[in-house]
């Protein structure tokens, strides 16, 4: 999948060149992958509830079917993502896009300095940065085969959602292009998990060699995960740190690495 460093690079280029930013979430992406007929067949039990719907699985000769053979990828199949990306990458190359040697999930096409496009693929999510008519042309090309999810794209005027991150590009009164990244849902979840900040917390500098996994004692009591789910908290913090809160990423990574 697309690395977060590549995502930041794409957003920096959008700032430098005042380029358009779009986000597309592919609807039912994994269902578009096709299984190779030469691979061993994948047998499936008929889904529960077919009898209640009045549907009885049958073979071509009319006998009752006790299993199905999958012909295309489905959600839950281990290689569904791989099959989808193989098909989708072929689709991207059909638009004249080339695969980056730096990040295989970054695709680009440059016609000239005023017409270029970058497409970052993160599973079934696409981040698009470009100038000129190529962005519109690609969206029309995309609609010819795939369908966009209803909850993807522009959330509010000028604000696009990508991987749960709100991306807003704006121009200041001095003509400076800036991008704001935020995620109200993740921050709301963090507040629900953490509650009010305890008053007895002590700030410590994360210097080299500091011991973070201090054994439990009277002064350092062990707190149940039912009271405070530390793993979930630092999972959200790490995502926030890698995606847009770069200032707290180092601290979160150091603490998360000491969790056992």
Segments predicted by a language model, with ranges:
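Long, low-complexity, charge-biased intrinsically disordered regions
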Residues: 1-260
């Amino acid at each position: 999948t697309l690395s977060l460093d590549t995502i930041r690079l794409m957003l920096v280029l959008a700032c430098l060149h005042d380029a358009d930013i779009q986000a597309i979430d592919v609807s039912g992406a994994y269902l578009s992958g096709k299984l190779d007929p030469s691979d061993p067949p994948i047998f499936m039990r008929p889904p529960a509830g077919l009898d209640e719907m009045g549907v009885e699985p049958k073979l071509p000769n009319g006998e009752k079917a006790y299993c199905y053979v999958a012909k295309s990828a489905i959600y839950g199949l281990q290689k569904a993502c791989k099959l989808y990306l193989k098909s989708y990458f072929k689709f991207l190359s059909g638009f004249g896009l080339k695969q980056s040697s730096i990040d295989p999930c970054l695709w680009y096409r440059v016609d000239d300095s005023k017409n270029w496009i970058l497409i970052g693929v993160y599973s079934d999510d696409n981040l698009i940065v470009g100038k000129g008519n190529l962005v519109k042309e690609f969206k029309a090309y995309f609609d010819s085969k795939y369908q966009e999810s209803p909850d993807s794209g522009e959330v509010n005027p000028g604000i696009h959602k990508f991987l749960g991150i709100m991306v807003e590009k704006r121009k200041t009164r001095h003509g400076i292009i800036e991008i704001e990244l935020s995620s109200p849902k993740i921050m709301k979840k963090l507040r629900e998990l953490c509650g009010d900040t305890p008053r007895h917390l002590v700030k410590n500098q994360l210097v080299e060699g500091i011991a973070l996994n201090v054994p439990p004692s009277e002064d350092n009591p062990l707190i149940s995960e039912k009271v405070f789910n530390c793993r979930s908290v630092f999972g959200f913090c790490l995502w926030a740190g890698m995606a847009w809160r770069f200032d707290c990423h180092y601290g979160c990574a150091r603490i998360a690495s000491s969790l056992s």
